[in-house]
A protein has these predicted regions:
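Hydrophobic core segments of alpha-helical transmembrane domains in multi-pass membrane transport
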Residues: 19-20, 44-48, 98-102, 143-154, ...
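Inter-helical junctions in multi-pass inner-membrane proteins, predominant
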Residues: 4-8, 155, 191-222, 253-257, ...
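Pore- or pathway-lining transmembrane helices of multi-pass membrane proteins that form conduits
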Residues: 77-106, 115-118, 210-222, 238-275
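Helix-loop-helix "hairpin" substructures at the membrane interface of multi-pass membrane proteins
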Residues: 134-207, 229-234
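Transmembrane helix-bundle core of multi-pass membrane transporters
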Residues: 97-157, 255, 287-294
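Cytosolic-side transmembrane-helix boundaries in multi-pass membrane proteins
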Residues: 151, 159, 169-178, 246-294
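Single transmembrane alpha-helix segments in multi-pass membrane proteins
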Residues: 4-53, 57-61, 65, 69-87, ...
Length: 294
């Protein structure tokens, strides 16, 4: 048995963990974590298009951060102005950058996937050209534990309710003369920024076909963990392990398809067995208008 495909496990886990945190920020801002999928697609578009235009990897990551932030602001503003259902509105708006990413991926060869040495990795080490360089020489992967700790620390200081509608609800974070909507959008942008390192990791790990719908998988982990950071990160290990085992399914008929669908089936099982209370429809009308009520 070849163990090389399983080396993708830390990358898959890191990317899903970052997306779980992003979903928590969207949920605590009073919006739906379904919008994280649009943030991931926007970040991937920013990295790919930015590198095509500039040839500088880190500058393209800044472009990706801007693209993810713009999507968060635009989608949050539209959902707020039209008083749309956060889940339906976020899902519908996410289809726009996701479709654009699919069209770009099919438009031809992109520079980011064919540069030698690979951009975004530290070169000049003994791991150059080996399978281990994506683990040892990847600044994004090495920085992931720090980013997750920072995100968890920020959420730890905003413990009001399952969702937070605004960081301003915490007196320690209140900005004088600020409106709750502006604070909600600021939290939304902060959540969108966590998708940038996740997008960078996924583009490096899956250069031939950038993955989609992982934001939905991360949301399932967040919901099943009862909206906790570390619980969601631990639950993300299961789908990440299955995703890293996908190459083993090419040896038998329909194996690849089964392993491709299996992470989402596992996420569904998470929801069924671990979050029955979260999925139970509330009988009171307040549940439809108050984001702190599930």
């Amino acid at each position: 048995m070849v163990w090389v495909p399983l080396l993708q496990f830390p990358i898959e886990w890191a990317a899903l963990a970052l997306l779980v945190v992003a979903c928590l920020y969207w949920e605590r801002s009073g919006f739906s974590g379904l919008g994280v999928e649009g943030c991931v697609a926007s970040a991937m578009l920013g990295i790919l298009v930015g590198y095509e235009w500039t040839g500088d990897y880190w500058l393209s990551c800044l472009v990706a951060a801007g693209a993810a932030a713009v999507f968060a602001i635009v989608s949050g503003t539209l959902v707020h102005l039209f008083r749309a259902d956060p889940a339906v509105g976020s899902f519908a708006l996410s289809l726009v950058p996701t479709s654009a990413l699919g069209l770009l991926a099919r438009s031809g060869d992109l520079r980011l996937f064919h540069e030698v040495p690979p951009p975004g990795l530290v070169t000049g080490t003994i791991f150059d050209g080996t399978y281990a360089e994506d683990l040892i020489a990847s600044p994004w992967l090495l920085a992931t534990p720090i980013l997750l700790a920072l995100a968890g620390w920020l959420l730890w200081h905003t413990p009001f309710g399952i969702r937070l509608r605004a960081f301003g609800e915490n007196p320690g974070w209140r900005v004088p003369r600020s409106r709750p909507t502006a604070l909600r959008l600021a939290a939304l942008v902060l959540g969108a920024l966590w998708t940038v390192p996740a997008a960078a990791l996924l583009l490096r790990a899956h250069a031939t076909a950038p993955p989609i719908a992982l934001g939905y998988l991360a949301l399932a982990c967040a919901v099943a963990s009862r909206w906790t950071v570390w619980g969601g990160i631990l639950l993300a290990a299961g789908p990440a392990l299955i995703r890293s085992a996908r190459p083993y399914g090419t040896g038998f008929q329909s194996g690849f398809v089964i392993l491709d669908v299996a992470p989402f089936l596992l996420g569904l099982l998470y929801l069924v067995f671990l979050s029955r209370r979260s999925l139970r429809l509330a009988a009171s009308p307040q549940a439809r208008i108050d984001p702190d009520v599930l």
